[in-house]
């Protein structure tokens, strides 16, 4: 928020919206007409290259040629170059390094030999992108790494027929152009496993809308995930030749490619256990405080007027929780998300008794996007790397654990704040969305919450990624006390699978990340050791991306300055250089 309102500049001439009372959260004043939100002209994507691989060792889809043509057309219109091949010899580390993403276009069967598989794994571990289309799930059944990359493998399919696709995530670039449902005709795969527990589901099939679905009503059909250092996107559509002439499906593919290539950002962590607070159909449970309000159209709340706040009065939240929501600003618009405030019809109560997680492109650093407004700036480099530009959707996760407030933008932590003011305690309170003032129009969708009650949050497991995209690794997967800890190309092995405990330990292979002899001098070895609950085994994540050992006051550091496979980690004075930045699961 700001206490000084900006003048309105450059508003698009828009149609007048008719505000139906049941569809709008407004104060008890007469409805007002508003102009359509302005959106900045999108900037051109940076130039990059995409490899399209369509080798088939099994069934060959007649739509492959149409798919290649469509992808070339998308590239020509969106500043990427497509190289299409069926030659597996292309899969060398040198060749693959030219590409921001590799598309498996209805590949089938065993298409890469062991050497080529290794090269592809190395490419992905270095931050490459993968896009799987349709029969990419009918590929490489004997390569476990690939099954993890694709997310799920083909089981069966019924006849080609129309079906209703439910769009679960309308913020991702591959689905943001779609409505809440999408009517399509295609060949609908059933999968051997459900990817929901390991991937972020973007769209799923309504099995009641067609015949032959075998996934018990939970049938993901498009998803994304971060996997072994890579970005992986898969869509089950694309069997038919007609698919590649369908504007909506082509835009779906474009969004998947742009995300896999790192052009756009999204929260692609697996998501389960959330309860909807706003599902796009009505504002039941919400109440407007102060002037202005929100319009409701296309499953989206858009702020207008102000200064006011739409708050969830149906329930006060206590204990630990994770709040997620999607938001979009058209330009330099101002809004925010409030947490931890008492029930009140005065929007200033939230300002004075809670915390606002800011949405605003320009202001002082403690009052711009990702900041705890007026209290703590976001990690600006992390924020800027995670932020989609005006006119695009972004996703916040606001995680409350006791008095700790963590903010994630598109899946990346950008702020870590601890409250010390009893008046603003985060242990109980409501949540709200700010409508800041005339000219500030920010849209919100898909507001959901996952509560842990008063229980501590559970442990989190996965890779710990550091400098040069490499993973924290146990040398040769050894389990002896004193085994070296190093960085290594991410490989999804048990030697790189760490569990962050609620006791601030990092465990792998049944033992703990440990500072040798509990020392505190620069260069002290960090090793694997039997867990013993000492201060030498405690690590806390900082907002700047470092992992700090509270006992020594020093940070986990990849030694030296070249950071290749096998570089050991050690203890060192915190300096926030790239070799001290770690991304936790």
Residue positions per predicted region:
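Secretory targeting and sorting signals
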Residues: 1-30
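Extracellular glycan-recognition/adhesion modules and their associated mucin-like linkers
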Residues: 455-479, 494-521, 535-563, 581-585
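A glycine-rich, often tryptophan-bearing local segment used as a flexible ligand/cofactor-contacting loop or short
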Residues: 104, 109-178
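Helical hinge/lid and interdomain linker segments adjacent to catalytic or ligand-binding clefts
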Residues: 51-55, 59-138
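Extracellular ligand-binding/catalytic regions of CAZymes and related secreted enzymes
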Residues: 31-37, 44-48, 62, 73, ...
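Aromatic-rich beta-strand patches that line glycan-recognition/binding surfaces
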Residues: 335-345, 483-489, 524-530, 568-573
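Carbohydrate-interacting regions of secretory-pathway proteins
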Residues: 155, 269-455
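Catalytic beta-strand/loop cores that center a nucleophilic Ser/Cys/Thr
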Residues: 152, 156-229
């Amino acid at each position: 928020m700001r206490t000084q309102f900006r003048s309105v500049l450059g508003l698009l001439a828009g149609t007048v919206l008719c505000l139906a009372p049941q569809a709008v959260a407004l104060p008890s004043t007469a409805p007002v007409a508003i102009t359509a939100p302005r959106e900045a002209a999108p900037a051109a994507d940076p130039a990059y290259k995409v490899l399209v691989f369509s080798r088939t060792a099994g069934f060959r889809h007649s739509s492959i040629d149409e798919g290649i043509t469509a992808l070339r057309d998308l590239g020509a219109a969106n500043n990427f170059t497509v190289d299409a091949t069926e030659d597996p010899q292309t899969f060398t580390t040198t060749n693959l390094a030219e590409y921001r993403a590799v598309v498996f276009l209805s590949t089938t069967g065993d298409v890469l030999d062991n050497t080529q598989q290794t090269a592809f794994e190395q490419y992905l571990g270095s931050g490459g992108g993968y896009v799987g289309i349709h029969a990419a799930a009918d590929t490489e059944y004997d390569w476990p790494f690939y099954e993890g990359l694709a997310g799920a493998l083909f089981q069966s399919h019924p006849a080609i027929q129309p079906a209703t696709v439910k769009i679960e995530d309308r913020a991702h670039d591959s689905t943001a152009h779609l409505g809440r449902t999408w009517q399509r005709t295609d060949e609908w795969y059933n999968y051997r496993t459900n990817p929901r527990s390991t991937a972020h589901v973007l769209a799923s099939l309504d099995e009641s809308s067609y015949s032959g679905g075998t996934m018990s009503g939970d049938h993901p059909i498009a998803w994304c995930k971060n996997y072994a250092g890579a970005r992986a996107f898969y869509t089950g559509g694309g069997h038919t030749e007609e698919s590649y002439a369908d504007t909506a499906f082509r835009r779906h593919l474009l969004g998947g490619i742009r995300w896999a290539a790192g052009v756009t950002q999204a929260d692609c962590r697996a998501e389960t256990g959330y309860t909807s607070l706003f599902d796009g159909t009505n504002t039941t449970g919400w109440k407007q405080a102060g002037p202005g309000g929100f319009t409701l159209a296309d499953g989206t709340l858009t702020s207008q007027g102000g200064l006011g706040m739409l708050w969830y009065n149906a329930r006060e939240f206590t204990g630990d929780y994770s709040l997620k929501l999607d938001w979009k600003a058209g330009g330099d618009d101002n809004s925010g998300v409030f947490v931890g405030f008492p029930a009140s019809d005065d929007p200033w109560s939230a300002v004075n008794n809670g915390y606002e997680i800011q949405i605003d492109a320009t202001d002082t650093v403690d009052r711009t996007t990702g900041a705890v407004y007026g209290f703590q700036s976001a990690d600006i480099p992390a924020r800027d790397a995670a932020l989609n530009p005006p006119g695009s959707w972004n996703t916040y996760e606001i995680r409350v654990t006791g008095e700790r407030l963590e903010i994630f933008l598109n899946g990346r932590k950008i702020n870590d704040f601890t409250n010390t003011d009893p008046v603003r305690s985060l242990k109980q309170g409501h949540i709200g969305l700010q409508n800041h003032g005339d000219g500030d129009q920010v849209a919100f969708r898909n507001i959901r919450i996952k509560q842990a009650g008063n229980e501590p949050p559970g442990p989190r497991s996965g890779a710990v990624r550091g400098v040069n995209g490499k993973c924290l690794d146990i040398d040769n997967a050894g389990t002896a006390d004193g085994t070296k800890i190093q960085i290594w190309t991410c490989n999804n092995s048990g030697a790189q699978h760490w569990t962050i405990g609620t006791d601030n330990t990092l465990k792998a292979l049944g033992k703990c990340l440990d500072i040798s002899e509990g020392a505190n001098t620069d260069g002290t070895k960090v090793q694997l050791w039997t867990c013993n609950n000492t201060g030498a085994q405690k690590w806390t994540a900082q907002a700047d991306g470092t992992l700090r050992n509270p006992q020594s006051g020093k940070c986990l550091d990849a030694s030296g300055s070249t950071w290749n496979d096998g570089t050991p980690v050690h203890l060192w004075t915190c300096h926030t250089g790239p070799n001290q930045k770690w991304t936790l699961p």
